[in-house]
Amino acid sequence: MAIRNGEYLVITARDLGASLKHFRTMAGVTQTDAAEAMGIGQPYLSSLEGGRFGSSLTHALRLLRFVGCEVVVRPREPRG
């Protein structure tokens, strides 16, 4: 996973999971609290952070790279 200018370049589902974990941790939120706020179980959130999304996401990421695109995860701009 490449990090540039505070952004995560997502090449694989595992990269996306790592970015989820990174930004959740930076926000000071536990898996349990995040899962509860989202209405999902903590084990499911853990699997997402481990990059286990299913084959459709993997194929979508591969197609995006094939056609010359990239997926980047970055913090939102502050609202104000």
Question: Where does each model-flagged region fall?
Answer:
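N-terminal flexible/basic segments that precede or flank functional cores
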Residues: 1-15, 50, 70, 75-80
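N-terminal first-folded block
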Residues: 13-25
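Residue-level signal for the short linker/turn that defines the boundary of a DNA-recognition helix
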Residues: 18, 28-29, 55
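Base-recognition residues in the alpha-helical recognition helix of bacterial helix-turn-helix
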Residues: 42-47, 58
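Alpha-helical DNA-recognition elements
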Residues: 46-47, 51, 62
